[in-house]
Design a protein with these regions (language model features):
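Serine-hydrolase catalytic machinery in alpha/beta-hydrolase-like enzymes
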Residues: 1, 6-98
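Catalytic histidine-centered segment of alpha/beta-hydrolase-like enzymes
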Residues: 160, 184-196
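Gly/Ala-rich beta-loop-alpha elbow adjacent to hydrolase catalytic centers
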Residues: 104-113
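Active-site nucleophile loop of the alpha/beta-hydrolase fold
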Residues: 28-29, 127-135, 155-157
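Residue in the alpha/beta-hydrolase core beta-strand immediately N-terminal to the catalytic nucleophile
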Residues: 102, 124-126
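Short beta-strand/loop motif that positions the catalytic acidic residue
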Residues: 146-147, 151-154, 158
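Catalytic histidine neighborhood in serine/cysteine hydrolases
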Residues: 171-187
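Short alpha-helix in the alpha/beta-hydrolase fold that links the catalytic acid
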Residues: 138-140, 148, 161-171, 193
Length: 216
């Protein structure tokens, strides 16, 4: 439950054996169909626990629906969602008792990650297709002065922010590890890109789990 007393819908996918690391997923914008079942995150939950021992935590931000249900509240354009991110991080540490937590944001979720996942217990951030529509410069300055790893994967053909534009947008955050992905688009459609992104997540969280199998 959030501090403004909203109940959020979520799911936790946990390995049968040892947990190598935990991953909290912040989904794309629900106004464009984003939710906790957005395909990269759904496939991460289905695969990474067994393949790499990574625990995957997904949830719907306020007012967002998926097959599992609808989170209470209403979409708040990335403002009230700060409470959702805080509640999810607290849940990970206080209820799940995670030891190492990374936060991954995709599209709208990257703005949520940068702006609201500053909790010192978070080990690092992964940004997928960052549009940089809601993150002010002072937030980038915060992360520039922070020692935790932040990695951004920017599709070559992203219609919101391509690699060349990303270099300019992130110029006040030179510490960022910005990785352009040739041939990719904003939504990472296609199994080759899914496997690539899941492999990159594993590389950051649990490199001993590489290479990921093509099938399980």
């Amino acid at each position: 439950m959030t501090s403004d007393e909203l109940t959020l819908v979520g799911e936790v996918a946990t390995p049968l054996g040892e947990i190598t690391a935990s991953l909290l997923c912040l989904h794309p914008n629900p106004t464009g169909g984003g939710m906790m079942d957005s395909h990269i995150f759904k496939k991460a939950a289905n695969r990474l626990p067994a393949m790499a021992g990574i625990q995957v935590i997904r949830f719907n931000t306020r007012g967002t629906s998926s097959e599992a249900g609808t989170s209470e509240g209403a979409y708040d354009h990335g403002v009230g969602e700060s409470e959702d991110v805080t509640a999810a991080i607290n849940y990970c540490f206080e209820t799940l008792k995670v030891k190492t937590l990374w936060v991954v944001g995709w599209s709208f979720g990257t703005d949520l990650a940068l702006c609201y996942a500053k909790d010192p217990r978070v080990a690092g951030l992964i940004l997928l297709s960052p549009p940089m529509q809601r993150t002010p410069d002072n937030v980038l300055e915060f992360w520039q002065n922070d020692s935790r790893p932040v990695v951004a994967y920017v599709p070559e053909h992203d219609e919101y922010l391509n690699p060349e534009q990303a270099v300019e947008r992130f110029k006040i955050f030179p510490r960022l590890n910005l990785i352009p992905i040739p041939g990719a688009k904003h939504l990472w459609v296609g199994e080759p890109f899914v496997h690539l992104i899941l492999s990159e997540i594993t590389k950051q969280l649990a490199p001993q789990g590489l290479p990921l199998p093509i099938e399980i």
